[in-house]
Amino acid sequence: KYPSHGERFTGEPAYFRHVRMASERLFADTDTLARDYTWAVFHQPNGKFPAAIAAKLGFTLEQTAPGLLAPRIGNTYSGAVLLGLCNILDAASPGDTIFLCGYGSGAGADAFSMTVTKNILGYDRSDAEKLETRLADTTEVDYATYAKYRGKLVMGGGE
């Protein structure tokens, strides 16, 4: 029902090792540093891991905040980096540079460098709501309702 981690191959030790290595490799291959990017987004199993690795690599809160969604919406697993990228692209301008680093539990990490082109101006962004608008349109539920929908509470047969 819940994801489990395979000791040293997943979870905290692996996340920081793989994400750091992939990020540093991209920096070396592209002759860049964190300060050279407008935005950055990392895999987000929680809010702490990406914030910590971003700081260790030299990224600022201004660079990472728009792409850091896990503290607000939880762990979206493989969708985390892409949702962060969507939020960044909603505000991106031509010339902005974007650093992305995804991570797969125990399988490693991949880092990418992107540059927003002038072509972004040609897209009619009014066709779809911005991600921030969707995230603001929430319905809060109490714990009992949440537990019911998640199958944590099972109603008895009255026996």
Predicted regions and their residues:
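Phosphate/pyrophosphate-binding loops at sites that engage ATP/ADP/AMP, CoA/4′-phosphopantetheine
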Residues: R20-T38, L57, A91-A92
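Claisen-condensing/thiolase-fold acyl-transfer catalytic domains that form or cleave C-C bonds
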Residues: W39-E159
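Active-site pocket-shaping loop/turn-to-helix segments
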Residues: K1-M21, P71-G79, L83
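Short, contiguous, pocket-lining structural segments
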Residues: E7-V19, T32, V41-F49
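A generic structural signal for ordered alpha-helices
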Residues: K1-S4, D31, Q63
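Arginine residue identity/basic-tract feature
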Residues: R8, R17-R20, R25, R35, ...
